Amino acid sequence: MAKGIIIVSDPNPLGISHKLIAPTIKLLYSKRGLDCSVIDLYRDEFNPMATDATAANLIARHYKHIIKTADHIHFISNVNLGGVSPGLEGFFDQVLNKGFAYDVVNNKTKSRLHKKEVYFYLHHSKKMRTRFNAAWMRLKFSVIPTIFKSSTIFQSDLTWGINEVKSKKIKKIRNKLISKLFENK
């Protein structure tokens, strides 16, 4: 049975990550009888600056175990000043590191997580969203080829201004998630 994990890195518990994207993904899994759990890096007080020597890094070991057992991994992050959240950057450094997520053989990276289905959900303020922004480029040319080999990146600039616009955008995002997550299943 497939197992999903949702990793949320958004400090706002009332934001789109917690109120729309994560619940929608979790609902899709539960409707199909699949297990899906949520990791909230901010609620867990994950320290993106921790090192292997600190006691705070025990949580990184726990996250590694969860990643190992998951078939589908969903990363949700807001984009600040052109990059993913510091919590998610710390997660990449501490959890998805060399020796766990990939190895280097003859100066080439060899993924250990290449069989996982991976999805990234990035949401921006309207002013920062461009197709080829810094967060997208970091994932597309650094994180994904090294660790996962392939994945899907969703980008959104959802704003909470006008209710009619908000409803249309939410419906569009939800339909996109449904079609991408379970397109051939």
Give the positions of each predicted feature.
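Short, solvent-exposed amphipathic alpha-helices that sit
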Residues: S17-Y29, A134-K149
